[in-house]
Amino acid sequence: MATERHYSPLDRLLLQADTAMRTLLPFSGQPTRPSPAIVQPDADLDEQQARHIAGLMRINHTGEVCAQALYQGQALTAKLPEVRKAMEHAAEEEVDHLAWCEQRIRQLNSHPSVLNPLFYGMSFGIGALAGLVSDKVSLGFVAATEHQVCKHLDEHLEQLPHEDEKSRAILEQMRIDEEQHAESALEAGGYRFPAPVRFGMSLLAKVMTKSTYRI
């Protein structure tokens, strides 16, 4: 029977650095699942449509960068091994989303946000602090964040042109995954944040969406 490997603090820091590089460098993320867009037909989009869709996908890509950083920060400071493993597993699934969004952005002749390193650092710090408070708060933060992501995905799905089936397929699968992450975090004992905290998180999310739509 295989034994679980135990990492030293230095090992974990090196793994965090490697994850950050793979998250932020172009074409670095290797998805474990093929993009849902592969089987969808190409759409005849005009320049304005393509630019708008690229902006939406750039927002979603940065959202996944933030989620990846959040999970990594929480995994670094989580107190219970099972919580740490849950964070690391969720982060692995976010790699798929990162790769899918970047692929679609490139197909639309655009680029990920130049602000990604800033948002990664901020999200990592928030995740690490949440993990230091307690695993219950950490898991609750995951649930609240993923619910916020689901709201953004719903809004973006409404804005997509009907003919853009590639982007739609990606966002619909992401929506399914993110909802599962939120429910799993709550089932694991995550704290349900009160409305004022969720409102504050939504304001921060708006800063991210407004700034990354174009850059």
UniProtKB/Swiss-Prot annotation:
Keywords for the protein's UniProt record, in alphabetical order: Cell membrane, Iron, Membrane, Metal-binding, Monooxygenase, Oxidoreductase, Ubiquinone biosynthesis
Subcellular location: Cell membrane
Principal location: membrane
EC number annotated for this UniProt entry: 1.14.99.60
Domain of life from the UniProt record: Bacteria
UniProt function note: Catalyzes the hydroxylation of 2-nonaprenyl-3-methyl-6-methoxy-1,4-benzoquinol during ubiquinone biosynthesis.
InterPro entries attached to this UniProt entry: COQ7_proteobact, Ferritin-like, Ferritin-like_SF, Ubq_synth_Coq7
The protein, known as: 3-demethoxyubiquinol 3-hydroxylase
Cofactor-binding details, from the entry: Binds 2 iron ions per subunit.
Keyword Ribosomal protein included in the entry's annotation: no
UniProt topology in membrane: Peripheral membrane protein
Cofactor(s) listed in the protein's UniProt record: Fe cation
Source taxonomy: Bacteria, Pseudomonadati, Pseudomonadota, Gammaproteobacteria, Pseudomonadales
One GO CC term, this protein: plasma membrane
Coiled coil (UniProt feature): none
One Pfam family per UniProt: COQ7
GO biological process: one example: ubiquinone biosynthetic process
Sites where the protein binds Fe cation 1: E64, E94, H97, E178
Catalytic activity field: a 5-methoxy-2-methyl-3-(all-trans-polyprenyl)benzene-1,4-diol + AH2 + O2 = a 3-demethylubiquinol + A + H2O
Native organism: Pseudomonas putida (strain ATCC 47054 / DSM 6125 / CFBP 8728 / NCIMB 11950 / KT2440)
Gene3D superfamilies linked: 1.20.1260.10
